[in-house]
Design a protein with these regions (language model features):
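Signal-transmission linkers at sensory-effector interfaces
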Residues: 105-107
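A generic structural motif
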Residues: 81-85
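Amphipathic alpha-helical "output/dimerization" segments
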Residues: 86-103
Length: 107
């Protein structure tokens, strides 16, 4: 395994993006009202208590990380309900994996 997550969403890399462009089966039904963490320029562990994070996600203690999908204008957002926090090595792996996926998508 590269990293353990409960769900994944693909978004546009702008704050005005629709929620989500694509999402996994475990994606929470409660969408964020706004996406203040966008745009992203690199992989990052996100603050799970930020204003944009829905209360339902916070109640589940969902840890969040995201990475841009190369230069295709998309971002992958992953959630881990119940934690633990994403380690820096996991965030780096997410960025590396997102780069590979972006390379495949543009071909």
């Amino acid at each position: 395994r590269v990293l353990r997550v409960g769900w994944c969403a693909v978004l546009g890399n702008t704050p005005e993006t629709q929620w989500p462009v694509f999402g996994s089966s475990g994606l929470p039904e409660t969408p964020p009202e706004h996406l203040d963490f966008l745009p992203l320029s690199g992989p990052v562990a996100l603050d799970p208590e930020a204003d944009w994070v829905p209360d339902a996600w916070q109640q589940l203690d969902t840890k969040l990380a995201a990475a841009p999908l190369g230069a295709i204008g998309k971002v992958v957002l992953v959630g881990r309900p119940g934690g633990p926090d994403f380690r820096p090595s996991e965030v780096a792996r997410l960025g590396y994996l997102a780069g590979i996926v972006a390379t495949v998508l543009v071909r």
